[in-house]
Amino acid sequence: MVLSKKLLKHKSIKHSFLNRSGGVSTGIYKGMNCGKGSLDQKKNVKTNLITACKKISSSYIKLVLLNQTHSNKYHFINNYNLKKNYKGDALITKKKKLILGILTADCAPIFIYDKELKLISAIHAGWKGAYKGIVKRVVKFFVKKGSKLENLIAAIGPCISQKNYEVGNDFKKKFLKQTNKNRIFFERKKNKTYFSLNKYIYFQLRQLGIKKIDIIDKDTYNPRNRFFSARRSKFNGENDYGRNISLIMIK
């Protein structure tokens, strides 16, 4: 379990970026696989989700998850609906005791909190979602709801590190076409190109005017017993992979 020091200061919320330890899954999913979309046994995933939620709430669990699509779509949860299928990549709420969850396996989980309005968001940002502007859309929604940028606190959770995120030339060209300033997120070593996802997201948050940003510098690729990693599983020839979960709620 990893916590943001900046968010930890605020007692009206609870959060956690969880790793794979402590669950009941076995095999390639060993530990706390929370991915409903994985090929793991459904009963194990359900048990793991309950265990994860109890890390931040001992009371009745109301957990909202997404059908994540690497998009820039978000949902503002005003009324709790357990059966609703939320399709997109960000959740926002002001409701108390409602846990927002994001699943990742190399992509970045992001939390945003307005300390005055008591508004929270959980964002799933892989390169596609970040490129499409999911972070910008969520921040704009906060502002529309009355947030002042100086009151926003953001935390970027564990994701794949730059040294393990090799990309192709077409990938880099796509980002440079967006703006040549994106070149700073790429590094060239031994004829290979590497991309920094968390740095790219950090600079987006800064450009939007958020100054209080925490980067959890934990690599999901290595070591293998700490987090689930889609890229590592593919490299090892595994047919599937587990998902890490990140949770945030207003008390």
Task: Spell out what each predicted region is.
Residues 1-251:
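Active-site microenvironment for binding and transforming phosphate-containing groups
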